[in-house]
């Protein structure tokens, strides 16, 4: 078979060459379609599993944020034909198992304010939800442009704790990085401790047995104490209440378990915490799927989030979830327990919210392709308005523009 080249001369191609050209043309068509559908600087109305949401696009990424909870439920690359979000979708997982799941704001990356863990019996009687009020409220949305950035700001009052929670997502045109800035305002006239966690959670199929790995900027760690080994279809595999150095945790069988890895033969439930590196101002956590050549990560200040809780739910169904939960406290436990303990590893377990005042936090999240052979993250740095991600053993790095910085 022959085709006419640009020179006007006939060129001959093997069938494999023709197949390549067809695939290449399909990719060009897809990217052109994506560019039309996901223009730079777009905010629109959308849904997540039938629930009202706002979509934010910058030509490279598309985010879906639900009005309930200001929850980031999906993040997708414009050039990804799979449209694969790395984030946990419990509604889809339940549906695929022939079950139902009611959305309460808990999915993907949701916020736990003011509370991270179970409410006390008295709080529960007063209507306080598990993980605080912020993820359970319905938010007002305002969107717009700030220079080359598209923004979506979501605001809600937390009626029980008398706080106002405001979260702003900002995405610069064409970048793989999103800035998330939050304000928490007290409406009361006294100082009080605040319990706050960013419940970032990845899920299947991005979370894949024997493939997906998690890296972070910390070492001193502890497994969560527990009493019950078996918990329905999953069982504990870590010794409870034991200190260890990330990522090798003590297993019940006496052998160390590498917590970077997603376990084969899933039927496990893991829980541990890591104190983030006290020698660094900026901390990071990443989730990497080398088979799909995709990476999700976060960069944030240690002064705002000194802890990272690891929750791994690996049922035999393969509908898995893993929390990358950076927070003010090591574990999701009732506030009374947190305040009574005060510190762990000589590090505070809460932050203060002054009377009639406001505290702020900010983090960056990124989602991007990685090169072939990139299999481990040794460091993530924010320098010169760029995020640099390194795999030193492979002698590879990924550099992403991060105009907004921290």
Language model regions located:
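Intrinsically disordered, low-complexity regions enriched in serine, threonine, proline
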Residues: 18-20, 164
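Surface-exposed acidic/polar loop and edge beta-strand patches at domain peripheries
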Residues: 39-179, 187-406
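Bacterial N-terminal signal peptides
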Residues: 25-36
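Short, linear, compositionally biased motifs with a strong N-terminal bias
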Residues: 14, 31-32, 207
């Amino acid at each position: 078979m022959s085709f006419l080249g640009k020179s006007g001369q006939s060129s001959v191609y093997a069938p494999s060459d023709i197949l390549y050209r067809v695939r290449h043309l399909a990719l060009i068509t897809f990217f052109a379609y994506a560019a039309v559908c996901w223009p730079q600087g777009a905010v629109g109305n959308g849904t997540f599993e039938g629930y009202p949401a706002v979509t934010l696009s910058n030509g490279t990424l598309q985010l879906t944020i639900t009005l309930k909870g200001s929850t980031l439920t999906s993040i997708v690359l414009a050039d990804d034909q799979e449209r694969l979000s790395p984030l946990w979708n419990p509604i889809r997982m339940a549906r695929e198992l022939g079950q139902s799941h009611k959305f309460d704001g808990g999915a993907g990356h949701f916020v736990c304010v003011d509370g991270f863990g179970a409410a006390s019996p008295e709080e529960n009687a007063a209507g306080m939800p598990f993980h605080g009020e912020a993820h359970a409220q319905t938010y007002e949305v305002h969107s717009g442009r700030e220079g080359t950035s598209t923004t979506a700001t979501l605001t809600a009052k937390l009626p029980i704790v008398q706080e106002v929670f405001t979260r702003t997502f900002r995405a610069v045109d064409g970048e793989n990085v999103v800035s998330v800035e939050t304000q928490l305002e007290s409406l009361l006239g006294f100082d009080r401790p605040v319990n706050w966690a960013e419940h970032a959670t990845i899920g299947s199929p991005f979370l894949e047995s024997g493939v997906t790995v998690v890296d972070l900027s910390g070492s001193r760690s502890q497994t969560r104490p527990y009493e019950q080994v078996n918990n329905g279809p999953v069982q504990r595999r870590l010794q409870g209440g034991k200190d260890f150095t990330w990522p090798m945790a003590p297993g019940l069988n006496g052998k160390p378990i590498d917590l970077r890895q997603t376990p084969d033969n899933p039927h496990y439930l893991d829980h541990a915490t890591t104190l983030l590196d006290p020698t660094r101002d900026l901390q990071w956590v990443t989730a990497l799927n080398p088979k799909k050549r995709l990476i999700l990560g976060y960069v944030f200040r240690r002064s705002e989030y000194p802890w990272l809780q690891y929750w791994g739910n690996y049922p035999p169904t393969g509908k898995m979830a893993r929390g990358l939960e950076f927070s003010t406290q090591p574990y999701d436990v009732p506030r009374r327990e947190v305040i009574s303990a005060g510190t762990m590893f000589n590090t505070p377990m809460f932050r203060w919210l002054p009377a009639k005042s406001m505290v702020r936090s900010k983090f960056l999240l990124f989602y991007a392709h990685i090169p072939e052979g990139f299999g481990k993250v040794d460091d993530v740095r924010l320098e010169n308005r760029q995020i640099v991600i390194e795999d030193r053993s492979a002698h590879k790095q990924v550099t992403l523009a991060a105009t907004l910085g921290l």
